[in-house]
From Swiss-Prot:
Key words of the record: Cytoplasm, Phosphoprotein, Ribonucleoprotein, Ribosomal protein
GO MF annotation list: structural constituent of ribosome
Gene symbol of the encoding locus: rps601
Name of protein: Small ribosomal subunit protein eS6A
Biological process annotations from GO: cytoplasmic translation; ribosome biogenesis
Function according to Swiss-Prot or TrEMBL: Component of the ribosome, a large ribonucleoprotein complex responsible for the synthesis of proteins in the cell. The small ribosomal subunit (SSU) binds messenger RNAs (mRNAs) and translates the encoded message by selecting cognate aminoacyl-transfer RNA (tRNA) molecules. The large subunit (LSU) contains the ribosomal catalytic site termed the peptidyl transferase center (PTC), which catalyzes the formation of peptide bonds, thereby polymerizing the amino acids delivered by tRNAs into a polypeptide chain.
Subunit-structure text: Component of the small ribosomal subunit (SSU). Mature yeast ribosomes consist of a small (40S) and a large (60S) subunit. The 40S small subunit contains 1 molecule of ribosomal RNA (18S rRNA) and at least 33 different proteins. The large 60S subunit contains 3 rRNA molecules (25S, 5.8S and 5S rRNA) and at least 46 different proteins. Interacts with snoRNA U3. uS11 interacts with MPP10. Component of the ribosomal small subunit (SSU) processome composed of at least 40 protein subunits and snoRNA U3.
InterPro entries assigned to the protein according to its UniProt record, in alphabetical order: Ribosomal_eS6, Ribosomal_eS6-like, Ribosomal_eS6_CS
PTM remark: Phosphorylated.
Miscellaneous: There are 2 genes for eS6 in S.pombe.
Amino acid sequence: MKLNISYPANGTQKLIEIDDDRRLRVFMEKRMGQEVPGDSVGPEFAGYVFKITGGNDKQGFPMFQGVLLPHRVRLLLRAGHPCYRPRRDGERKRKSVRGCIVGQDLAVLALAIIKQGEQDIPGLTDVTVPKRLGPKRASKIRRFFNLSKEDDVRQFVIRREVVPKKEGKKPYTKAPKIQRLVTPRTLQHKRHRFALKRRQAEKNREEAAEFAQLMAKRVAEAKQKREVVKARRASSLKK
């Protein structure tokens, strides 16, 4: 069985193949989400604590959280379920998924390091992979650099270097567009929107008042006409 071990604190992961079933015995009959000590896996994992995050069986079917079985089942999946990406709105599909209990039929078991042990694992805990992109939202940039509301966020955007594909061209830097950035221009747009809204509301009120007056006038005219017709009919009956 292969162990795909990830270390979220450093952003690294490593695939380790283990042939001895006795070293893997500690994972058997455990469920996804459970924490397992890594002492019996090998001396290099002494003191480590792993969390089972998933896995695939020998045919490639992924483990599904919540299915308390050590084998494959066919489930009707919809949007929002793991292991399924709908192609159309409202689409559902019956797909084969592996239960969340670890067994011998797994080819790869995914683990995350919850607690680091005594010694480093080469290529996993001794290496740090920096994030490729920095924060993009204005409030997150402020939190990241501990800025106040008076500081200009645009000066603290993390730029990344882009190497052109064509030879001979110099590398250049790119910065993301800051989202939810409050500037005088955005405030002016907001004031303009509210002014348009107020103007439209006033116009609607005036039109409603005019329409009410017109309706009252038409109702009065119709009433007068009915009274004239009624009087004419009464006078003709007297004759």
